[in-house]
């Protein structure tokens, strides 16, 4: 399955006065991302502030992204939760919308399941889903790490097509790549590890930085694919400051700040997250401006 190389984990545009998901801003953002290097979009993921979106808001968001996208980019819907039955029901509902290519299912958080529980959770979701499933391993948020052996077992299921790996452990990621089928997709969940993961056989990145440096991310990946390793490495090094800067305070506040500054209105973050203060914004803007020097 081809979901692309640069997949943007899209922020959710919120109307600043009404505190509602905003159709006009979604339309503008989706077009911006597709025009600037995104092969695909993850909708209602971590960067999309999924914990503070209601069920109805997520459905509205999916519908509006599907409408604007019109089949141009691959669409991956975030449907995971720490409730297996709820994840299954929501995934089925999303499949009925049409226009979604896959679902991203996060490791159950807070409950702290063991590896057997994690395996059973993903098997249950995959067997009930009409859409391909991408596993999302993010132990920094979910507390539990999906061990390589568990992902390797899950990769044998026909409906589990890939993993977004945000563990930051290259040894584990290398093991997953080595011991899963050739067509099992392994995406970096960390912008700064995109090139290292490509180097050990990964497929691309589910990116935050691509909101503002999407063309550069795409250029880096394409250079590596052509065998221009030094060029790819040079681009990687040049992008590291902004990749790190976008996580200097909790995501997605920095990304929303830069988009708003660039005239791509996406509104504020929702509590309990807070927007950047003036000093933080000035520092981040300086990092971005430094890329062109």
From Swiss-Prot:
Gene3D superfamilies: Aldolase class I (3.20.20.70). Homotetramer; dimer of dimers. It is found in: Cytoplasm. Its main location: cytoplasm. One of its GO terms (cellular component) is cytosol. Catalyzes the condensation of (S)-aspartate-beta-semialdehyde [(S)-ASA] and pyruvate to 4-hydroxy-tetrahydrodipicolinate (HTPA). Pyruvate binds at residues 47, 206. The record marks 46, 110 as: Part of a proton relay during catalysis. Pfam families: DHDPS. Keywords: Amino-acid biosynthesis, Cytoplasm, Diaminopimelate biosynthesis, Lyase, Lysine biosynthesis, Schiff base. One of its GO terms (molecular function) is 4-hydroxy-tetrahydrodipicolinate synthase activity. It catalyses: L-aspartate 4-semialdehyde + pyruvate = (2S,4S)-4-hydroxy-2,3,4,5-tetrahydrodipicolinate + H2O + H(+). SUPFAM superfamilies: Aldolase (SSF51569). It comes from Listeria welshimeri serovar 6b (strain ATCC 35897 / DSM 20650 / CCUG 15529 / CIP 8149 / NCTC 11857 / SLCC 5334 / V8). PROSITE patterns: DHDPS_1 (PS00665), DHDPS_2 (PS00666). It is an enzyme of class 4 (lyase). GO terms for biological process: diaminopimelate biosynthetic process; lysine biosynthetic process via diaminopimelate. This is 4-hydroxy-tetrahydrodipicolinate synthase. Pathway: Amino-acid biosynthesis; L-lysine biosynthesis via DAP pathway; (S)-tetrahydrodipicolinate from L-aspartate: step 3/4. Belongs to the DapA family. Disulfide bonds: none annotated. The active site is at residues 136, 164. It comes from the Bacteria.
